[in-house]
């Protein structure tokens, strides 16, 4: 048994810039701040906030849709309900499906959107790639939605091992 104290989960503070927008809901602001924090490299948060402004304006002008609503619907279309965990039992490794916490599902959705946007080759800059991927994900298309579907197919294929995760949790390992 570990002698360390349990880690306190820190809340990511929403960006001050988007709290003043009355049209955005608290869930949309939370998703925008998660996207900003995931894209930030070497502490350049202001640069990423400007990039998010470009993304929202691009969606607004090209598709005549609210950028925050597109972000929310894209994350809701991409977030997984099941994940596959590797579990080693008796020398064999099993892929065991387990349910996903809501905060983790949003984190995975944002990560998958960013990764599939980075793999796009049609657009030139990253903000254009993310804007297009967000719009496609909000319509149920794109690489991030495909990643979610692949994840769910893997979980369904390994449904026979789902009883192992309950045994593992009841033992306390």
From Swiss-Prot:
Q: Which GO terms describe its cellular component?
A: small ribosomal subunit
Which GO biological-process labels does this protein carry?
translation
Q: Per its UniProt record, what InterPro entries does this chain match?
A: Ribosomal_uS7, Ribosomal_uS7_bac/org-type, Ribosomal_uS7_dom, Ribosomal_uS7_dom_sf
The record describes the protein's role as: One of the primary rRNA binding proteins, it binds directly to 16S rRNA where it nucleates assembly of the head domain of the 30S subunit. Is located at the subunit interface close to the decoding center, probably blocks exit of the E-site tRNA.
Q: Name one GO molecular function term.
A: rRNA binding
Q: Which family does it belong to?
A: Belongs to the universal ribosomal protein uS7 family.
Which NCBIfam families does the record associate with it? rpsG_bact
The protein depicted here goes by the name Small ribosomal subunit protein uS7
Q: SUPFAM superfamilies of this UniProt entry?
A: Ribosomal protein S7
Its assembly, as annotated, is:
Part of the 30S ribosomal subunit. Contacts proteins S9 and S11.
What are the UniProt keywords, alphabetically?
Answer: Ribonucleoprotein, Ribosomal protein, RNA-binding, rRNA-binding, tRNA-binding
Protein's UniProt keywords contain Cell inner membrane? no
């Amino acid at each position: 048994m570990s002698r360390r104290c349990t880690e306190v989960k820190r809340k990511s503070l929403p960006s001050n810039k988007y709290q003043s927008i009355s049209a955005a809901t608290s869930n949309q602001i939370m998703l925008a701040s998660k996207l900003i924090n995931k894209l930030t490299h070497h502490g350049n948060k202001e640069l990423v906030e400007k990039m998010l402004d470009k993304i929202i304006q691009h969606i607004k002008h090209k598709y005549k849709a609210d950028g925050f609503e597109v972000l929310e619907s894209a994350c809701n279309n991409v977030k997984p309900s099941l994940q596959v965990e590797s579990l080693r039992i008796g020398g064999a490794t099993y892929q065991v499906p387990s349910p996903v916490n809501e905060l983790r599902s949003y984190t995975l959705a944002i990560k998958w959107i960013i990764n599939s946007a980075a793999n796009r080759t049609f657009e030139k800059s990253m903000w254009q790639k993310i804007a297009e991927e967000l719009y496609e994900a909000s319509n149920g298309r794109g690489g991030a939605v495909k990643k979610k579907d692949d994840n769910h197919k893997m979980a369904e294929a390994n449904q026979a091992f789902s009883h192992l995760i309950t045994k593992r949790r009841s033992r306390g390992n």
